[in-house]
Amino acid sequence: ITMKIGVMSDTHGSLPYFEKALDLLKDCDVLFHIGDVLYHGPRNDLPEGYNPKGVIKEINNLDNIIIVRGNCDADVDQMVIKHPIEDGYILTEVGNVTFLLNHGYLESKEETIRQAKDKGANVLILGHTHVKELYMDEDLVVLNPGSTSIPKDGSHSVAIIEIMPIEGNHHEVDMDINLIDIN
């Protein structure tokens, strides 16, 4: 069975872009939100359709989402969001692939990549920069889905990861990762 993971980050309280992202990711088995969920933070302009309460409602309607704490996420957010907002590094496995999720602001990227390799991750997913990235560092896939609502590289974006079992092989999988613009 093919597993689909939807990845978004840095929604910063924009309801229209959160809804557009959800629409693109509606067929996914699980969602990863890589942080900066509700607030725009002191360095960003207000995103289009800024409506943290609306985003809370949408998030609380979702069943299968993992949320990483970003630098703009406050303690109070956990009182209104029913899913855990996890600090630091989250190691999780989906379809035989090990993911390390981290917002990407606490340590240097080099250190975060080293952590991912030390923890045996196949894929490291970061946010924070609002810039899309997808590349290999030795055997590690490094992905940043960019920002859903306040991109710094011109286009609002999400990512979809597809994990397909290989016939007759219980350990290896094929993986496709696509960055998708949501303009």
Predicted regions and their residues:
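Active-site-proximal beta-strand elements of phosphoester/diester hydrolases
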Residues: 4-12, 97-105, 141-146, 179
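Internal catalytic-core helix/loop-beta-alpha segment
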Residues: 82-131
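Active-site environment of divalent metal-dependent phosphoester hydrolases
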Residues: 12-19, 39-41, 72-78, 106-111, ...
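Binuclear metal-dependent phosphoesterase catalytic core
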Residues: 95, 114, 119, 136-138, ...
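Hydrophobic/aromatic beta-strand patches that form the interior of the parallel beta-sheet core
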Residues: 32, 66-68, 125, 141-143, ...
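Core catalytic region of metal-dependent phosphoesterases/phosphodiesterases
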Residues: 4-94
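Short linear motifs in intrinsically disordered
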Residues: 79-84, 122-124, 150, 167-169
